[in-house]
Amino acid sequence: MDQRLSGYATRAVPRYTSYPTVPHFSPDIGPDDYATWLSALDPTDPLSLYLHVPFCKKVCWYCGCNMKLSARYQPIADYAATLRKEIGLVAGYLPTRMRVSHMHWGGGTPTSLSESDLGHAMEVIDHHFSFASDAELAIESDPRTLSGDMIKHLAGLGFNRASFGVQEFDPQVQLAINRVQPPDMVRASVDGLRAAGIANINFDLIYGLPHQTVGTLTRTIELCAAMRPNRIALFGYAHVPWMAKAQRMIDAAALPGAAERLAQAQAASEALVAMGYVAIGLDHFALPDDPLALAVRQGTLRRNFQGYTTDTATTLLGMGATSIGRTPHGYTQSIAETRAWTRAVEAGTLPIAKGCALTADDTLRGWVIEQLMCNGRVDLAAAAAQHKAPLGWYAEAEPDLAQMERDGLIYRDAAHRITMTKAGAPLVRTVAAVFDAYLRAKAAQHSVAV
């Protein structure tokens, strides 16, 4: 990377899976606001569901997710029972039995639920919602614990996409992050899912891990590509031990520096493209016939809390402790602590801890940021016209944009269009950040740009 650009790579900026971002959510938004927003939804619009199951059998030291260890099943069963109640509670505020276009189970490890508890949850969902004929039903799992019986059960419940956290296959790296899973173990799960009819497989990979090199990551990609997952997400490891306690187990001295991280990201991207994958936005890759690649060609790619998506629904209902949702009126996040979340649901209260009511300015800036993140370009004049804003609404960003143009991150034209350059594309988060009014007003802790 050009020396002019390298300074941008170490800037701490959000991943922009929402705007405003989660650090700017406020406890002033609560259950009453969410109830009002739910009842105001257009009953003819499709929506998406996200269900969070925080339980895992082992702690992966790189993980920054909200997760819990449980040696016994009873706490998981209790959680599943409360989740079923929350589904009914949320549905009770909707104007009708609404149609679902996407559903995603995340965690944690959602397949830590028993077949019975997962099945009962799906029965409750089916009672309160209908599914579009082409709905995507996705679930995250762990090849170290996924059984053949659970695979058959998932297929029977209608799931059509599964996601695995592969991260890295090098044994030394796996030991350093406390996630040991040989390639054959992952392949067995992939083969089992596809044999059962769940043909769509996602892998997550991470660069910037302890002891990781360009060589280990490239070899991991070769092994992954041989299994032909439909989608691969490639994330940079964010070392934030002050936020994610498990990361305190990672030897910070073994982490690659900024130049090595950048080399890993570039080598991985080039390897995936060479192996037939289409680059999607900042950090995703897909086979050419995958709906995500089609969305890029059609200009319909979106970005949400799961990353890049084909989901165009304007409402995402989050259920489960710490889950995040969105309606056209704003964002909400549920209570993170499971006992407090349980008490709220048992009391018949929507378990909202905080959120953000969207202003017209939020909607405008969020649209611009999403266009940059998804398409690598944005028409600022069109944004102003579409959102009924003056053309100079982004005046405070102009000095930064001018500098970024001089440094070769972006092209600009007289029609107020911005396009990422090839060299600047990996730094799109940094460009998006100049439109973030909250980031300008209040410094927040985020991961570095690459």
Predicted regions and their residues:
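Flexible, acidic/Gly-rich N-terminal and inter-domain linker regions that tether
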Residues: 1-48
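C-terminal scaffold of the Radical SAM
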Residues: 39-46, 69-93, 99-389, 449
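Short alpha-helical scaffolding segments that buttress acidic/His motifs in well-ordered protein cores
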Residues: 50, 63, 367-371, 431
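Short amphipathic alpha-helical interaction segments
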Residues: 390-405
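Minor-groove-contacting beta-hairpin "wing" of winged helix-turn-helix DNA-binding domains
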Residues: 416-421
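Short, amphipathic alpha-helical interaction segments positioned at domain boundaries
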Residues: 423-450
